[in-house]
Amino acid sequence: MPNDTHETAPTRSIQAGDVQFAYRRFGPRGATPLLLLNYFAAHMDDWDPKITNGFATEHDVILVDYPGIGRSSGQTPSKVAALTNACVAFCRAIGLTQFDVVGFSLGGMIAQELGAEHPDLLRRIMLLGTGPRGGEGLVFDDLSVEELDDPSALLRKAFFTPSEASQASGRAYMERLKSRSADRDTSVSRQSASAELAAIREWGVIPTSDRFAMLGKIQHPTLIVHGNKDVVVMPINAFLLAEHLPNAQLIMYPDARHGAHSQHADVFLKHVKLFLQ
């Protein structure tokens, strides 16, 4: 409903193929829909309400759980291409013909695949804390799903720098994640997280030729947002995206890691507003 928010939007479901997708939709209808694609081992409640509610003042916001994640049924795909196909099936099931997309980390990989392989579905693309196929340091040999056992500590370390200002932003962000008190999403299983990690690692393998050829296929206006001290997806990946995407602009936020858009939420929302206009 138009008057719903991140905190109040009901969790809905729709069948697409063999998956029952869980999703939420809020904000004014009529404008170009804005689909949000999430990061590794994250569900709908892991989006920052300051960001989603900020989007929803002017945009028809759609959150969705990937197959096997949160309340969505099915088995989580272990390749980005398969995750992308699942997202396409979901979008068609809810009647989307064209939309803007925000892809955060893993979601940004899916957004790139959407732009390259399903260009007619997209109008504009926003890539947050992500990297190109075959980017730098994207195989994540040292990352394991066991690190998810203490998600709060992991988020504080991965999303925010040690500076006092960044840590204060991190504490505020962690509190915001609690703002939805009812109808919360379901935690992500290790099996599903492992599948997503496999998808990211497959994406990160450097090809033997035409390393960034896929990016040349993405003609959509694209906004790249990154933290200058990101320890999850190294900042060099943002520059690679900006160099090889034909119609991209890059914003690098200072003193920021993987949660740059949440740490700098106010200015980020202004940048997004300008970009989507």
Q: Which stretches of residues belong to each language-model region?
A:
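Hydrophobic, aromatic-rich cap/lid helix
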Residues: 184-211
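Catalytic active-site module of serine/aspartate enzymes centered on a nucleophile-bearing elbow/loop
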Residues: 248-277
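Active-site loop/oxyanion-hole signature of alpha/beta-hydrolase fold enzymes
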Residues: 62-102, 270
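Short beta-strand/loop motif that positions the catalytic acidic residue
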Residues: 218, 224-226
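Conserved HGGG/HGGXW glycine-rich cap/lid loop of the alpha/beta-hydrolase fold
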Residues: 19-73
